[in-house]
Amino acid sequence: MEWSEVEVHTTNEAVEPVANVLTEFGAAGVSIEDVADFLREREDKFGEIYALRREDYPEDGVIIKAYFLKTTEFVEQIPEIEQTLKNLSTFDIPLGKFQFVVNDVDDEEWATAWKKYYHPVQITDRITIVPSWESYTPSANEIIIELDPGMAFGTGTHPTTQLCIRALSNYLQPGDEVIDVGTGSGVLSIASAKLGAKSILATDLDEIATRAAEENITLNKTEHIITVKQNNLLQDINKTNVDIVVANILAEVILLFPEDVYKALKPGGVFIASGIIEDKAKVVEEALKNAGLIIEKMEQQGDWVAIISKRGVE
C-alpha cells in the first residue's frame, strides 16, 4: 500500500484542533513534534543530550504529521484539507507560520513515526496518562489512564485536557454522576471513572471520536461505568440532577448550550468548561452567568482557560 504524510507547521495552541481536523479527514495516525520532544527523545539514562542538527526539529511552534492511504479520494481532498485547517483561524485559533506539505512515505514509516513522540504525562500528583504500548510502573495510589492516541483526540498533553483533569480531581466526589460533552478520546470520562464517579455519559457528534472513546474505555476497563453516545452536545439528553458536566470544546461551541447545562445539573452541581482561548474567556463567562450559573473559579495554562461554574443551591 502507498501512504501519504501530511505535514503541518503550526502553533502549540492549534495542536488539538489541527489534529482533530486531520483525523476527521481519515488520518490513520498522527504525530506531534516540538523541540522538547526531540530533546527528550535523545536524552539517555545518564541525562546526556545527543547533538542535534538544526534541521532535525522545528525552530518554533509544532510540526504535526498525519498519515493517509494514498487513494484517489485522498488526493482530491488535499486542497479541502488545507483550506479547512486555514479556516481554524476564524475561531481565533492562532496558526502561526502555517505551512502545509504532502509527502509520500513507506508502510513502516507511517506505522511507527507517530508513536515515537508520545510518552507518559503526569497531569496531577495522582494522575498520569500513559500510551498503551509503554510499560509504566505506577507509584502507590497513582491513577493510570492508558490511551491509544492513534485517533488524535485529547491525548492529555494539551493544556485544555490537563485543565479539565485537574478540575475533575478537585471537584469530583466518589459516587458522582457525570456527563462528558465532546468526549473525543474518552480521556475525561476515564479520569472521572478512576476518580470514583458512579456513572458517566460520554457524548460526541463525531462517530470516529465515539469509536476511539469506546476503545480507550475498554482498554481502561471502565466500560461498566461509562456509556458512550453519538450525540450533538446535550440535545435530547434528558438527564437532570447530574453532579458534574465537563466539556473540553471550543468556546464557540460552549456558547451554544449553557442553558442545557443548567437544566442538567443538580443544585450545587459543577460545570467544568475548557477549550477556551484566553480572548474568548469573558464572552463564555458572561454566557454562563446569563444561563443562571455562578462562576466558581477560572484556571489558566498558557493561552487556554478553564471556567468552573456551579448551579446555585435553591
From Swiss-Prot:
GO terms for molecular function: protein methyltransferase activity; protein-lysine N-methyltransferase activity. Pfam families: PrmA. It catalyses: L-lysyl-[protein] + 3 S-adenosyl-L-methionine = N(6),N(6),N(6)-trimethyl-L-lysyl-[protein] + 3 S-adenosyl-L-homocysteine + 3 H(+). S-adenosyl-L-methionine binds at T161, G182, D204, N248. Its main location: cytoplasm. Its EC number is 2.1.1.-. Keywords: Cytoplasm, Methyltransferase, S-adenosyl-L-methionine, Transferase. Disulfide bonds: none annotated. InterPro entries: Ribosomal_L11_MeTrfase_PrmA, Ribosomal_PrmA_MeTrfase, SAM-dependent_MTases_sf. It is found in: Cytoplasm. GO terms for cellular component: cytoplasm. GO terms for biological process: methylation. CDD domains: AdoMet_MTases. Belongs to the methyltransferase superfamily. PrmA family. Methylates ribosomal protein L11. This is Ribosomal protein L11 methyltransferase.
